[in-house]
Amino acid sequence: QVGPDDEQQLKRWLCLTAMRGTFQGSVETTINRFLRALKESKRKPGAALVDALHKDEARRIRPDELLHVSPLWGSAVQVLHAWLVARTAKDWLDEDRTIDSLARTEGIKYPGGDLTVHHIFARKVLTDAGLRIEAANRPANFALLSRSTNAEFGARTPDDVLRSLTPDQRKRAGVQFFGEAAGDRLRHERYEEFCEWRAARLAEALNEFLGID
C-alpha cells in the first residue's frame, strides 16, 4: 500500500524523469537501473526509485529549464499540469472549471480535452515586435486554460488581458504567476525579463511541489 510519503516520492520521480528526459535514448538500460533499485533496496518503492536517479536527474528544477523552446505538450507542461491539479487551480474566466476537469472533458477530439496551452505573450504580439515565433514557445510563457478562455484572449497583449480581469479572475490567474506582480514586464519590450521573472517563480513552486529542498 502506498502511503503519503511514498506517494510524494513517486510523484517526484515521475516528474523529474519527465523533465530530464530520463527514458529517452537507451530505454532498456534505464529501465533495468530502476528495476534493480526496486529489487535491491530495503526502502519503500518511491524512495528506492528516487535514490536511483543520477545526480543531474535528481537536482532541483532550475529556472533556465523553463526558458528553453519546448513543445506545447512537452514534459515541462506535463509537470506544470500536475502541479496545477495539485493546487486545484481553476480556469481564469470560469471559476467552476478546474484545470483537472478541463483535461477530463469528454467528447473533445484533442489530447488535452478542453484544456489548452495559452501563450501569455501571444505569438503574434512577439512577431509584430520583431521576435522569432519560436521565442513564444517556452514554458515560462505558457499557462494552462480552457479552450474558450484562450480563444477569448486571442492575440491580445498580456497587459490588456490583465486589465480585463476582475479581482477574482486575477486571483485565479495569480496561481499561475500572471498578474500585477509582473509589473511593466508585461510589455513586449520586456518579454525576456518577464520570462526570467516567471521562470524563477515557477521553478520555486515546482521544487516545493516535489518536496525538493
Summary of predicted features, one role per range:
Residues 18-118, 125:
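Intrinsically disordered, low-complexity N-proximal targeting/linker segments that flank membranes
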